[in-house]
Amino acid sequence: MSFRSQTSSTTSMRPVSSYSSRSISLHRSVPLGSSASVVGGAGGHGARISSGGFGLASGYSSGSSFSMSVKGSGLFNNEKETMQILNDRLASYLETVRNLEQANSKLELQIRETLEKRGPTTQDYSAYEKVVEDLKSQIYDMTVNNARLVLQIDNARLATDDFRVKYESELAIRQSVESDIIGLRKVIDDTNINRMNLETDIESLKEELIFIKRSHQTDVEELRKHISECGVQVDVDAPKGQDLSKIMEEIRAQYETIIQKNREELKDWHNSQILIVETEVKENTEALQKSRTEVTELRRQFQTLEIDIESLRTMKASLEANLHDVEMRNNMEMEGFNFIIRQQEADLQQLRTSIQAQVHEYQALLNIKMKLEAEIATYRRLLDGEDFRLQDALAVQTTKVQKKITVTETVVDGKVVSQSSEVQEIKK
């Protein structure tokens, strides 16, 4: 971003006779009954002054001055000598004018050389801008890396939370499976106790059956023995009674069938229960082993993530320390750059002040030049033989000079990188 500012100043030259520091005065007085005349010439050129008294004086601030006076109450006796003196004074005056013009030209040349010499030094900030851009790019890259690390840490934290939730759910499942296994073990124990009780009942029933068989056999033998000893034969005209032994055999067969059936049913039920329990135990054992494997894997992943998080934290701390160091170095370099900029601005302000002083000096010299030109013109008219008052001539010749000073400044990002000035004179 650049802009230009122009500053214009207009200087109007008033009539020469109005300046107090440099004055040209011409007094003419003609007393009663007196007359004066001066006639002279140099190189075929003459001038006539008719006055009773004549005086001319001029001075200027540079230290060079001349004065010319012609006094008399009558006619001059030596006109050529008087004109020679006037010509010498005029030549000295013109020499002074030429010296002032040369000094003015030298001053303008010095102003241009100063502007050309100091101009490029104030606008060469390319090296500083490159360093600043490099530092800005480094800061931006470190900021992006820091943001990336923060994002990775957040992702790792979310993954850790997810694994923790999975671990807790798997732990709850493991605990429930272990409680189910404990319950199944209790069921197995109860089943074993019932089986042992049933086996005990079977043994007792077998013993009771053997005892009943023996008792029945004893009773039958005793009954047969008693019948044989009695030797009584009784014939009864009645239907033949049932054979008790046959009945006992049938009862025994029925009981054995029932016992065998119950034994087979109990055995089948016991085998089925054992098979179910073994299947459940096998499934629960497999699930428990799988859960243990998953828990081990999750624990390993959790430890790996903890190690990664710790390494990321260490990297983050080191990057923050590096960023702090870079910021400190950047601040120090920026302070140095600001000091250089302030120094350059002070030099620029001093240059502006110097230019302004030189402009004022140039304006003063220009005023002197204009006044001298007016006085030279007046002398020429006097030498040409014109007889009039100098004040009237100076009053008629009013020269107006408009002086335009253009100061151009190029500002980039609030910094003055170049400056130039241009002086224009417009006579009206």
UniProtKB/Swiss-Prot annotation:
Region (Coil 1B) location: 132-223
Region annotation Linker 12: where it falls in the sequence: 224-247
Any GO MF annotation of the entry: structural molecule activity
Region of interest called Linker 1, as start-end residue ranges on this chain: 115-131
Region (Head): 2-78
Key word tRNA processing present: no
GO cellular component: keratin filament
Record bears the keyword Repressor: no
One family name in Pfam for this protein: Filament
Record keywords: Coiled coil, Intermediate filament, Keratin, Phosphoprotein
Region annotation Coil 2: where it falls in the sequence: 248-385
Domain IF rod span(s) in chain numbering: 79-390
Region annotation Tail: where it falls in the sequence: 386-428
InterPro entries: IF_conserved, IF_rod_dom, Keratin_I
GO biological process: intermediate filament cytoskeleton organization
Annotated spans, Coil 1A: 79-114
Processing after translation: Phosphorylated. Proteolytically cleaved by caspases during epithelial cell apoptosis.
Site feature: Cleavage: D237, A238
Note: There are two types of cytoskeletal and microfibrillar keratin: I (acidic; 40-55 kDa) and II (neutral to basic; 56-70 kDa).
PANTHER family: INTERMEDIATE FILAMENT (PTHR23239), KERATIN, TYPE I CYTOSKELETAL 18 (PTHR23239:SF349)
Similarity section: Belongs to the intermediate filament family.
Protein purpose: When phosphorylated, plays a role in filament reorganization.
Record's subunit section: Heterotetramer of two type I and two type II keratins. Keratin-18 associates with keratin-8.
Name of protein: Keratin, type I cytoskeletal 18-A
UniProt organism field: Polypterus senegalus (Senegal bichir)
Lineage: Eukaryota, Metazoa, Chordata, Craniata, Vertebrata
